[in-house]
Design a protein with these regions (language model features):
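An acidic-aromatic substrate-binding cleft motif
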Residues: 102-125, 132, 138-140
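Catalytic domains of carbohydrate-active enzymes, especially glycoside hydrolases
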Residues: 131-152
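Flexible, acidic glycine-rich loops studded with aromatic residues
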Residues: 325-330, 335-340, 344-468
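Conserved, mostly hydrophobic/aromatic
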Residues: 75, 116, 137, 205, ...
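Bacterial N-terminal signal peptides
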Residues: 6-14
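Active-site neighborhood of glycoside hydrolase catalytic domains
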Residues: 236-237, 242-339, 347-350, 354
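Contiguous, structured surface segment used for ligand recognition
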Residues: 19-111, 419, 430, 446-468
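Aromatic- and acidic-residue-enriched carbohydrate-binding clefts of CAZyme catalytic domains
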Residues: 109, 153-200, 215-255, 283-305
Length: 468
């Protein structure tokens, strides 16, 4: 007996399609293999739904006949993806009463990791809105939702024993001088419900607790965690970073992070904790008497060795819980350990990151900002911080996560990841407007083999998805 189709979202796009006469499937991301038949199907009733383990856990085969559809899947993930394809065909059929071609779709993802990141730290996203965002992700076969829960502008994770995270760190006076207070924090129950909602749609949730920097909101709540406490510190109201890093020589810092990781373990079953690790200026560590004494005692030559020691201690805390770390890759491979996973994000450094991480024995997720940062302007004239490149839909589509490298040089690449940073995205509508349709291009970059990808065909499909 086939189970009901999951409830998934639609999308509104705006652009002109290329001229195209032949009726084809409009599936995004493009399947690995499609065989079209001469017959036409005017119904897509699911006639059979079978598990065929030999296909592979995340693979499926969907056969469209004049009488209806037959789904074979290798496992739970493959079934979810097959149903997502069937949902897209149902939407296509709704706009084509004359029918769609019969055929056989044999499909599996190119990469195991296909993620989007949202940024509730900068602008809080209510849990109900996150679920709407997740529906869109499932429609396009994304399988990782990355929650950037903490930053200079807000802290969104409740931690027992630390009430000022809610009363202080989750609130700011305004955003960019607008005079409007902003606040928000998830409850533990909301996050657990989100995890379950995502799991039902084949999506794993990855929490991020940024450290040792990007912590001005934490400093406002608990200044004693920092090298030079500033009791008058406020949660940041603009974009940008601060110089404040948590002090690794203070026991209360490690007690706090142990509590944070315990809470994450109870909420997020993935066991993965993204630790940030990016944009952490060490000048205050250099000046801090406690840090200087620790470097002398351990014969550390500089603050970068102290950074390595910081993350070694953090990783040890995680290991006690059976958790594993991930990081934004900063190019210094010496900070990370073989087998760990990093995200290549820095602009114009993708090839360099592929080569360095391969030599260091690291797993790499491609999130290169000039292709994958969906908060970047889509067209000239949209809001720009000055350093952002205009990232058009075609630029996103042009991404090959391996950059043409053979398997022996790029086999450590686990997939693709597109962040949607939210300094200027105050609500779900703004978030979706920035993310789509470019997220559709990222979905295809992560799922479809290069040999079946075509920009012109992608444009044709998007025109149909506008009607969905």
């Amino acid at each position: 007996m086939a189970r009901p189709l999951p409830i998934l979202g639609g999308i509104l796009l705006s652009f002109s399609p290329p001229a195209e006469a032949t009726v084809q499937y409009s599936i995004i991301p493009e399947p690995s293999r499609t065989e079209l038949k001469q017959e036409t199907a005017k119904t897509l009733q699911l006639l059979s739904d079978q598990e065929v383990p030999t296909l592979g856990t995340d693979a499926y085969r969907l056969t469209v006949t004049p009488q209806g559809a037959h789904l074979a899947s290798g496992g739970r993930e493959g079934r979810i993806y097959g149903l997502a394809t069937l949902r897209q065909l149902l939407d296509q059929l709704a706009g084509q009463p004359e029918g769609i071609p019969c055929g056989i779709i044999t499909d599996k993802p190119r990469y195991p990791w296909r993620g989007l990141m949202v940024d509730p730290a900068r602008h809080f996203i209510p849990a109900a809105d996150l679920k709407k965002f997740v529906d869109m992700m499932a429609y396009y076969k994304f399988n990782r939702l990355h929650l950037h829960l903490t930053d200079n502008q807000g802290w969104r994770l409740p931690v027992p024993g630390y009430p000022k995270l809610k009363s202080v760190a989750s609130r700011r006076e305004e955003s960019f001088g607008d005079g409007i207070p902003h606040e928000g924090m998830y409850t533990k129950q909301e996050l657990k419900e989100l995890v379950a909602y995502c799991a039902a749609r084949g999506i794993e949730v990855i929490p991020e607790i940024d450290m040792p920097g990007h912590n001005q909101a934490l400093h406002a709540a608990y200044p004693e965690f920092f090298c030079f406490p500033k009791p008058d510190m406020n949660v940041r109201t603009t974009a940008g970073n601060s110089k404040e890093l948590v002090c690794p020589q203070k026991p209360e810092v490690w007690k706090f992070y142990a509590s944070v990781f315990n809470e994450l373990k109870d909420i997020f079953p993935s066991g993965i904790v993204h630790l940030g690790g990016d944009e952490a200026p060490t000048e205050l560590w250099e000046k801090c008497p406690l840090c200087r004494e620790a470097r002398t005692r351990a014969a550390m030559k500089d603050e970068q060795e102290q950074m390595k020691a910081f993350f070694e201690k953090t990783a040890a805390l995680l290991a006690k819980n059976g958790q594993t770390p991930q990081f934004w890759y900063e190019g210094n491979a010496g900070i990370y350990h073989p087998g760990e996973t990093v995200y290549a994000w820095r602009q114009d450094q993708a090839l360099q990151s592929i080569e360095k991480t391969k030599k260091a024995g690291l797993n790499l997720i491609m999130a290169s900002s000039e292709y994958c940062y969906l908060d970047f302007p889509q067209i000239q004239g949209q809001r720009n911080w000055g350093w952002m490149k205009t990232t058009t839909l075609q630029k996103c589509y042009d991404l090959d996560p391996a950059f043409g490298k053979p398997e022996k040089e790029a086999g450590h690449i686990r997939g693709v990841h597109a962040p949607v940073w939210a300094e200027r995205l105050p609500d779900l509508n703004h978030l979706l407007y920035r993310a789509y349709p470019r997220a559709c291009a990222i979905a295809e970059a992560g799922w479809s083999p290069m040999g079946v990808r075509s920009w012109e065909n992608f444009r044709r499909k998007l025109a149909d998805h506008r009607q969905f």
